[in-house]
Amino acid sequence: MTSAVELTDDLVKEYLTFRGFTNTLKYFEVDIKADKDKGFRVDRIVEQLLQFVQSYDLNGLVEYWAYLERRLFSRLEDVYRPTIHKLKTSLFRYYLVYTIQSSRTDKAHEFFQKQATELQNQAEWKEWFALPFLPTPDSNRTFSTYFSRQWADTFTVSLHNFLSVLFQCMPVPKILTFQSDYQKIACLQEENEIMRQKLFALQAETYRLRKDGPSEPLVLHKLPHYVSNMDRLGDSELGSNIMSSHSNTNMNTPSQRTSGFLSSLLAQNKKPPPPKSTLPSVSSPTQSGGSVPLKKEVAVSQAQKAKELVGGTKEVRSSPNILGVPGTESSMVQQRHKRQQERKELLSKTASQVSTEKKAENSDADPDLRSDTQNDTVDAVTRGSGASGARKEEKPAQPFIVLSQDEYAEHHSSIMHCRVDCSGRRVASLDVDGVIKIWSLDGIMQTKASAISKSALLSLEWATKRDRLLLLGSEVGTVRLYDTEAKKNLCEIGIVEDMPRILSLACSPSGASFVCSAAAATSPSQTDPTYYSYGESGNNQVPGKLLLWDTKTMKQQLQFSLEPVPIAVNCTAFNHNGNLLVTGAADGFIRLFDMQQHQCALSWKAHMGEVYSVDFSYDENAVYSIGEDGKFIQWDIHKSGQKVSEYSLPSDATGPFMLSGYSGYKQVQFPRGRLFAFDSEGKYMLTCSSTGGVIYKLNSDGSTLENCLSLGGHRAPVVTVDWSTAVECGTCLTASMDGKIKLTTLLAQKS
C-alpha cells in the first residue's frame, strides 16, 4: 500500500501539472508535507512517535497518538481495544523511562502533572507515580524490566507490526489498486502469450509430421480442454449412409478430427499450408469475405470427405491432396470443380429438410451443435448471391477462440435487458415479468440480488459513478433507483403523467445526470406485429418526450426539443465524456444532441420505420444503427449524418422476435434492449440470431461485413446482447426468449 500511495501522489502531481492547475498543485504539495499519515509508511509513523519522545515533546506525543486513534484505530472492532490500550500505556512508559535515563526528572514530573487526571484511576499506573522519586529505578524489581534494551526493542517492533497489519487490512480507494491491477494484467498477458506460443508450436510440429508423411498414425499431444471442445463436429447434416462410411474411415485416421483445428491456425504461424488443406467455409459459395465458426468448417470438411468415400475409388485416390500431397494442376482443377458441385448439392437443402434429417437420424445429438449446424445451413441458403464459386484465396484465421460457454438460467420468461456494469463484474438482467436479477460475471455466476416489480418494467441502466445503483423505467411513468448491494429501492420518481412508458434510460458518464425517454400509452403496432399505423410522412407516429434529470437531486433539469413533432425515442447512448447524446426514434430519425448547449445539433432520416438500436463507433466519428427495415447502417456525424455503409441483416437479428409453440401458440416480442455490441477496439460486432449470437467483422473501409463466428447455444431467439471485455478475454452475453442467458468467453488471437 505504501508504494501505491507514493505512485498515486506522483500521478496526481503529473496530472495537475499537465492540466495547469498550479494553485491546486501547490496546496497539494503543502498537504503532503504536513501529512500526519506519513503516506501510510509505518516506519515514518514510528519514527515520528520516537522523535516526540526524544525531544521531550509530551503535548506533541499525546496529540499525535490521539490523531492515530481517530484516524486509524477507531475503525477497528472492539476486540482490539485492549491491544490499543496496552500500546498506549507502553508508549507513555517508554517516554518516562527515557526521561529518567537522560536525567530529565523535571520532564517526568511534568508528565504526571499533565496526565495524572487520566492515569490516577488506572491500576497499572499506581506504582509509576513514585518513579521520579526513586534514586535508582533501574535496579528496582518493578521497573528494572522497562529499563532494559530488550524491552524497548520489543515495544518498537510490536508497534511497527501492529500498524503494518492495520494498513494491510484497511480498505483503500480504487485508485490505489491501479498498480496491483496493472501487474495482474501484465501477468495474465504474459501467461496468455506463453500458452499461445505453446499452441503454435504444437500445431507447427503436427504440420511438420504430416508433411513428412509418417507410415503409422500420429500420436498427438493432449490438447487443452477448450481446444478439444471447439473441434466437435456438427455431423447432423450428413445422411446415415455417409455417417457409417465416414466412421469406418475415421477408425484408420484418428488424427484427422484434431488436425482440423490445428490446420486452421497455420496462418497464424506464417507458414504456408499444404495445397488444398484449407477448405472453404459453408458461406463461401454465396458470400465472399465471410467466415463461420470453426466447428462448422470441420463439419463441412468431413461431409465432403464422406461424399468422396461414397463416390468410389477415384475420389479415394485423390484424397492425398487433402492431406497436403501435391498433384498435377489439371487434377487439382478437376477436383476443385467436383467439390464445388458437391457443395452446391449440400447447400441446396432447405432448413426444413435439414431439420427433418436431424429428427430422424440425430435425435440424441447435442442440442448446441444441432442449432449451430442448422443456423449455418440457413445462413448459407438465405444469404445473397454475392459471389459465385469457391474462394481461391486462403481463408483468414479465426479472430477468436471460444474458451467456454456458460448458462445463467434464473429467469423463467423472455429477457428484455441484459447489461454489464461499468466495472465488468456484475450483470443486471430484466425479464418481461418484471423480475430483476443482479449476478456476478467473474468466477461463479452467483445471484447477488433479486427483485420483482409490481408494475411492468421497460428499461434498465447502470449508474456510471456509483456502479452499485440501477435505474429502472416502468410502464406507469416512474423511474426507480435501486441499490444492488443494500437490495432496496432508494427512491421512485414520477416522470410524465401523460407519457407513462419509459422506453429508454441513459446515464451520463459524468454521473451527474441521466436521460429519460417517455412515450404515450402502448400503440397497436407494439402488440400486433401485422399492424402498422403510419402518418403522412410514412412514419410510426407515437408521441413522446426526452427529458434530462439530475442524479443527485432526482429533479428534472430540462426537456429536449424534438423536431418536427414530439416523438417517442426508442434508444439513447452517450459518447465517452457525455458531451454528445445520440437517439433513435419511432419516426425513423436519428438525432444528435449537444449536451453542453442542450440542443439538437444534427438530425437525419435513417430508417424506414422505427430505429431500434443506436450507438457510437469506437473512435466516435460515426454512429451505427439498426432499424425496423432490417438495415444496419453506419453514419458519419462530421458530414451531417452522411451514410458510410449499409448492410441488410437477417430478420432474426433485428426483430420483431417470434417464438412458436404447440397448438398454434405464438409469442411476439419487439426489441427493447441492445441489438448489437462492439468489442473493446470496435473492430467486431455482436448481433442477435435465432439460435445464438453472431459476431461480424467491421472492415475499416466499410465495404463488407464479414461473418466471423456464430456462438450458438440457444433454443429460442436471442433478443438482446452485450459484450464485456477484460484483458484479451471477452465475455459475450446473449439473452433469449426462453429466459436463458449464455456467457461465451472468447480469447482474441493476435494477428
Swiss-Prot record:
Topology versus the membrane: Peripheral membrane protein
Any single Gene Ontology cellular-component annotation: late endosome membrane
Region described as Disordered: 237-398
GO-annotated biological processes: early endosome to late endosome transport; negative regulation of phosphatidylinositol 3-kinase/protein kinase B signal transduction
Alphabetized InterPro entries for the sequence: ARMC9_CTLH-like_dom, WD40/YVTN_repeat-like_dom_sf, WD40_repeat_dom_sf, WD40_rpt, WDR91
Keyword Translocase: no
Residue ranges, compositional bias (Polar residues): 238-267
Compartmental location: Early endosome membrane; Late endosome membrane
Major location (coarse): membrane
Keywords, sorted A to Z: Coiled coil, Endosome, Membrane, Repeat, WD repeat
Molecular function in Gene Ontology: phosphatidylinositol 3-kinase inhibitor activity
Record's keyword annotation contains Transmembrane: no
Source organism, top-level taxon: Eukaryota
Residue ranges the record marks as coiled coil: 183-205
Bias (Basic and acidic residues) ranges: 356-373
Record Gene3D superfamilies: YVTN repeat-like/Quinoprotein amine dehydrogenase
Classification via PROSITE patterns: WD_REPEATS_2 (PS50082), WD_REPEATS_REGION (PS50294)
WD repeats: 410-449, 452-492, 517-559, 564-603, 606-645, 668-706, 713-751
Family the UniProt entry places it in: Belongs to the WD repeat WDR91 family.
Job description of the protein: Functions as a negative regulator of the PI3 kinase/PI3K activity associated with endosomal membranes. By modifying the phosphatidylinositol 3-phosphate/PtdInsP3 content of endosomal membranes may regulate endosome fusion, recycling, sorting and early to late endosome transport.
Protein name, as recorded: WD repeat-containing protein 91
